[in-house]
Amino acid sequence: MRMLLRLLALTVLSLPMAAQAASNPRISSPDGTLSVEISVDNDGRPAYAVKRNGKPVIQPSRLGFIFIDAPKFERNFVIGEHKTRSVDDTWEQPWGERRVIRNHYNELRVTLGEKNALKRRFDVVFRVYDDGLGFRYELPDQPALREVRIGEELTEFDIADPATAWWIPAGEWNREEYLYHRTPVEQVGDSQTPITLRTDDGLHLSIHEAALVDYAGMNLTRVEGRRFRAMLTPGIGDGKVMRT
């Protein structure tokens, strides 16, 4: 059985380089505005990058997990099978300004597998719309991953350009009862999602999560500069998520 871990949504709200490896899987939105590319670095650490009209929006940002009581699962990966498909259908919402919503996206599914003896693997699935994208992790059943405890994610969002951020702090005693801060992105602390950003050239971004089923919620911690990393909500015991 495949287990859906999380769907992360990056929404591009406004209208406002380097050479790429030809072998890296990539996918574009139906109108070609947004594009996503998957890569691994020299240490085999997987990453993704997002461009809009050919300009970087998210610079290469890490993907993956930190497990508890298991060998490390963060490098020595190679890109395996990858598939694409296109969907254009509709769905009906029970309330809101529009009853029928068009669901039009291109999808890229990439398998990332270890080169070592364990041969563990995971899938990352991107759905790219004209105005945003979402991605999720899936852990297929496999002998070396029958049961895992996820201590943290390695998922990152490295914002390409200087930006203003609207955010509220995460992990504080009063939880949701805060006014939004408006600061340069380099001054953001630990932040709840959604966090909204406006780049200096007018592009608006919002990073949030969706489709949480039996999984920890996500906040963001700023690692350095404009680079953020997922920070899972603590659970009971050592692991933040248990997969069986």
Each model region followed by its residue ranges:
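N-terminal accessory beta-strand-rich subdomains and adjacent acidic, glycine-rich linkers
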Residues: 24-244
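Bacterial N-terminal signal peptides
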Residues: 6-16
